[in-house]
Curated annotation (Swiss-Prot):
The name this protein goes by in its record: Adenine phosphoribosyltransferase
Annotated localization: Cytoplasm
Name of encoding gene: apt
Protein EC: 2.4.2.7
Family: Belongs to the purine/pyrimidine phosphoribosyltransferase family.
Catalysed reaction, written as an equation: AMP + diphosphate = 5-phospho-alpha-D-ribose 1-diphosphate + adenine
Subunit structure: Homodimer.
InterPro entries membership: Ade_phspho_trans, Adenine_PRTase, PRibTrfase_dom, PRTase-like
Function: Catalyzes a salvage reaction resulting in the formation of AMP, that is energically less costly than de novo synthesis.
Origin organism lineage: Bacteria, Pseudomonadati, Pseudomonadota, Gammaproteobacteria, Enterobacterales
């Protein structure tokens, strides 16, 4: 099933926009409203599975927290394992970490050292692409473990914020179901 204009419009209409959240001047795109609609949620997963079903994916990685909500069902649909990337000290086994820059300061992500095997063909899934910093750090973790990652899938791409261009410089092809201007 290739996404039709009608299906994509249905998904886009399931996203609520909240003005001035979390601060004045921001138009927040709330993906949780899509999750509240089982038809929209199921369709978003079906479309991502359809796109990647013949891509030879061996693992799906999702970044905390909403990446879990989309990545895990995509992994099930593809018949492959799901690997969570989390904030520090949330994973119980041995991990490696990657620090990345935020607008004001830094943050860190971790992955289990045994979750990705050398040669794994990994798809990164997250709810939203903005500046790309979180996904860039996720890609670095996967590659440090020997995984191959060339694709990342998103429900929403805030295309004005430069995330897609940032990830393309890292050799990542980005796909999103819904582009929105970023604010």
């Amino acid at each position: 099933m290739t996404a039709t204009a009608q299906q994509l419009e249905f998904l886009k209409n399931s996203i609520k926009s909240i003005q001035d959240y979390p601060k004045p001047g921001i138009l927040f795109r709330d993906v949780t409203s899509l999750l509240e609609d089982p038809k929209a949620y199921a369709l978003s997963i079906e479309l991502l599975v359809e796109r990647y079903k013949n891509a030879g994916i061996t693992k799906v990685v999702g970044t905390e927290a909403r990446g879990f909500l989309f990545g895990a069902p995509v992994a099930l649909g593809l018949g492959v394992g799901f690997v969570p990337v989390r904030k520090p000290r949330k994973l119980p086994r041995e991990t490696i970490a990657e620090t990345y820059e935020l607008e004001y300061g830094t943050d860190q992500l971790e992955i289990h050292v045994d979750a990705i095997k050398p040669g794994d063909n990994v798809l990164v899934v997250d709810d939203l692409l903005a500046t790309g910093g979180t996904i860039e750090a996720t890609v670095k973790l996967i590659r440090r473990l020997g995984g191959k990652v060339t694709d990342a899938a998103f429900i929403i791409n805030l295309f004005d914020l430069g995330g897609e261009q940032r990830l393309e410089k890292q050799g990542i092809t980005c796909y999103s179901l819904m582009p929105f201007p970023g604010h």
